[in-house]
Curated annotation (Swiss-Prot):
Descriptive protein name: Transcription initiation factor IIB
Any single Gene Ontology cellular-component annotation: transcription preinitiation complex
Positions annotated as zinc finger (TFIIB-type): 37-68
GO molecular function (one): DNA-binding transcription factor activity
Family per similarity comment: Belongs to the TFIIB family.
Gene Ontology terms: biological process: DNA-templated transcription initiation; transcription preinitiation complex assembly
Organism: Methanosarcina acetivorans (strain ATCC 35395 / DSM 2834 / JCM 12185 / C2A)
Assigned keywords, A-Z: Metal-binding, Repeat, Transcription, Transcription regulation, Zinc, Zinc-finger
Ligand binding (Zn(2+)): 41, 44, 60, 63
PANTHER family reported for this sequence: TRANSCRIPTION INITIATION FACTOR IIB, TRANSCRIPTION INITIATION FACTOR IIB-RELATED
Sequence repeats: 154-237, 248-329
Function: Stabilizes TBP binding to an archaeal box-A promoter. Also responsible for recruiting RNA polymerase II to the pre-initiation complex (DNA-TBP-TFIIB).
Length: 337
């Protein structure tokens, strides 16, 4: 009996030692990665550091000094040269995302009737597999909250795709909507309205501005409802949203007008000067941005008409005329029409 207890005690000690070694190794790797981010070459002071994964070394790209050695590569042990090879060899799923109601952590039964070895499923088992696949789809959305999220997030994805918004905006919008659901802000409001308001808030947070009119075009609710819901959720969730800058609209408007980088740079310069003199305060950012682009296109010899600029910016020609006259007068810009 005593001998058995000794064996158990020694096994426990051995396990604790292994855990301590693993923990120490992880901490060391974290420290090394943190140091590597801040590291500079002690020989020449360069920050151009290159990870040589074949030799497991951290090397200065300028003078060739080996700064660190024997670091562990935590990536996969296999290599893939195209998408098909990557899909075949990968043993994990897609990363977690807030744009799916279950954050992408649930499983699904593939529609290709094949087993893990790639062999075709027998016809005798296909009926059972069909039933399993059907019930697996059902249990992914099991209650009212999940159904709400599934519908709202699909709406967010549809609107974001129609507006050509990047992945970061979609993730931010999904997080805003989830917070609204957690605080029970959806009650008494349409799912489409809250989703559109969350997308508008995410655009402002990520400095990828879209106007309420643009959001209205791709949503199924009115501009008035989007604005009202946006003000409500931004107040209740205490969202920190800075006023939209006209500069944020310049790249998109210039791209829509097929203008060169010189015009874009000149437009940004005009807007910065206008901001310093507080000429942008109390005015719509799209109108000011459109006026700056109109002036810059004339100065750089790539003239666009007021109608063309107005169509891309979603404002009227009168707005552009008023704003460009103000900018030209206050900034002493001579425009030859």
């Amino acid at each position: 009996m005593v001998e058995v207890e000794r064996v158990r005690y020694s096994d426990t000690l051995e396990r604790e030692k292994i855990r301590a070694m693993i923990k120490a190794r992880k901490e060391k790797q974290k420290e090394q990665s943190f140091e590597n981010e801040k590291a500079v070459c002690p020989e020449c002071g360069s920050r151009n550091l290159v990870h040589d994964y074949e030799r497991a070394e951290l090397v200065c790209g300028d003078c060739g000094l080996v700064i660190d050695a024997d670091f562990v590569d935590e990536g996969p042990e296999w290599r893939a040269f195209d998408h098909d090879q990557r899909m075949k060899r990968s043993r994990v799923g897609a990363p977690m995302t807030y744009t799916i109601h279950d954050k992408g952590l649930s499983t699904m039964i593939d529609w290709r009737n094949r087993d893990s070895y790639g062999k075709s499923i027998s016809s005798k088992n296909r009926a059972q597999l069909y039933r399993l696949r059907k019930w697996q789809r059902r249990i992914r959305v099991s209650n009212a909250t999940e159904r709400n999220l599934a519908f709202a997030l699909s709406e967010l994805d549809r609107m974001a795709s129609a507006l050509g918004l990047p992945r970061t905006v979609r993730e931010t919008a999904a997080v805003v909507y989830r917070k609204a659901v957690d605080k029970n802000l959806i009650r008494g409001r349409s799912i489409e309205g809250v989703a559109a308001a969350a997308l508008y808030a995410a655009c402002r947070q990520c400095s990828v501005p879209r106007t309420l009119d643009e959001i209205e075009e791709v949503s199924r609710v009115s501009r008035k409802e989007i604005g009202r819901t946006y003000r409500f959720i931004s107040r209740e969730l205490a969202l920190k949203l800075m006023p939209t800058s006209p500069i944020d609209y310049v790249p998109r408007f210039c791209s829509g007008l097929n203008l060169k980088g010189e015009v874009q740079s000149k437009s940004v310069e005009i807007l910065r000067q206008a901001s310093e003199k507080e000429l942008t305060s109390g005015r719509g950012p799209t109108g000011v941005a459109a006026a700056a682009i109109y002036i810059a296109s004339i100065l750089c010899g790539e003239r666009r008409t007021q109608r063309e600029v107005a169509d891309v910016a979603g404002v009227t020609e009168v707005t552009i005329r008023n704003r460009y006259k103000e900018l030209a007068e206050e900034l002493d810009i001579e425009i030859i029409l």
